[in-house]
């Protein structure tokens, strides 16, 4: 149950590595940031518990709760005051809910298992926790988890769930059961489909009035029978015989962390009848019920699945200038792991898009992986009290700027080098942005073709370049000198498609310079506007100077 898990501080801290840095804030700002986040979490909490409405995704709430705890620890605040759910329920649990401690990784699971035996793994079903009380073979009470000690009376609602047995016999005739009410699914694959806000949906169904029909889609997974049969197999057998079949179907004995990992992966990647957010490892033998207390269930632990999306703090905002002068915005992040990818940066988009997002350093954004593992922003989930946003560059850049290196042209100049080295232009194999930056920093290029003037000795003397790397690059530069004329023109940024240039058929710089706008307009995919841009490009002094420089180096098509 989402908010109920907050009763134990340590349960939240799995979201943050132990090395998470404390913010460099003044005491006044720290108090302000903490108070605002506490207030927001309290509002979400109230909406969730009192109205059954989730104003924020479960995972976002959990991660921001963990962030609050970290800030409180950094600045000496009370880490427990605001974390418990509001308790409107007054019905005591016959046996308290202990909660489950979360472990960060396989190594932690292995450590926990080391001195324990008779271990079992179960899915960590994503729903809302409940106590079911049977007396004389009848369901007499159903209690929401609440704060683990007291909760809401859900008896009438639970009696309307067909999947919950209304009567029991044998040892279960007088029993207290703890479990998870969940929304039934047909082959839910957690890795592909994510959590689907399952907890909030179930909570809403249990809170709202006049929704009898929706309760038909709920079921229950029993994960605890306090003071029940002494062995796990016997508990599971009797539960299954009474109509609580999911526990037996989805409980497996394990002897090692490898076993747990195998089952965890299988349940993460195959279809299940419920949403899960990890697995629970527990001992078959449990303490007597009189010893159960919230936060003290040391006989079970959880190993959660990696979230589909994670909340990341924005540590900086940078502006990148592309080869055509287009400005894009990149947000630097406090590193987060998504799948096996360490994400430190995310593309925001254009300046206009950045302004629409209203992202500043200190904000927290929800980040996920799009196609091909590219990080993307899903939403801004929390904004810092201080809005120190950098000013974007002015309108100094366009498609005809930065062919020559100047102090204000560094980013667009590098972007032009990256472009000319790409397969669409000169295809300088083995050279990416990092390599061009190293070369430019070491040899202070005057313009985008200055690298052609480098000697083999200069390449070998470039810091960070091995002898082998320098030799390969020298070979590449010599190959590039013989690229077709059309490739060089593409490298110079002519605003035409390669198809239009091929249709043109010019093989010399002189021919190309002599063409009129009317001529260019007749080529495929070249309208009046593009033809006009070609003439502007042709007449640009820097382009003319580059053409002369290439002619002096006897490059194909440029020599008289």
Curated annotation (Swiss-Prot):
Q: What class of enzyme is it?
A: ligase
Q: Which reaction does it catalyse?
A: NAD(+) + (deoxyribonucleotide)n-3'-hydroxyl + 5'-phospho-(deoxyribonucleotide)m = (deoxyribonucleotide)n+m + AMP + beta-nicotinamide D-nucleotide
EC number(s) stated in the UniProt entry for this protein: 6.5.1.2
**GO terms for biological process, alphabetical:** DNA repair; DNA replication
The active site of this protein is located at 124
Q: Which UniProt keywords apply?
A: DNA damage, DNA repair, DNA replication, Ligase, NAD
GO MF terms here are:
DNA ligase (NAD+) activity
The domain of life for this entry's organism is Bacteria
Matching NCBIfam families, A to Z?
Answer: PRK08097.1
- Spell out the PANTHER family in the cross-references: DNA LIGASE (PTHR47810), DNA LIGASE B (PTHR47810:SF1)
Q: Which family does it belong to?
A: Belongs to the NAD-dependent DNA ligase family. LigB subfamily.
Q: What biological function has been recorded for the protein in this entry? A: Catalyzes the formation of phosphodiester linkages between 5'-phosphoryl and 3'-hydroxyl groups in double-stranded DNA using NAD as a coenzyme and as the energy source for the reaction.
| Annotated protein name in UniProt | DNA ligase B
This chain's source organism reads: Citrobacter koseri (strain ATCC BAA-895 / CDC 4225-83 / SGSC4696)
Upper lineage is:
Bacteria, Pseudomonadati, Pseudomonadota, Gammaproteobacteria, Enterobacterales
Report the gene name: ligB
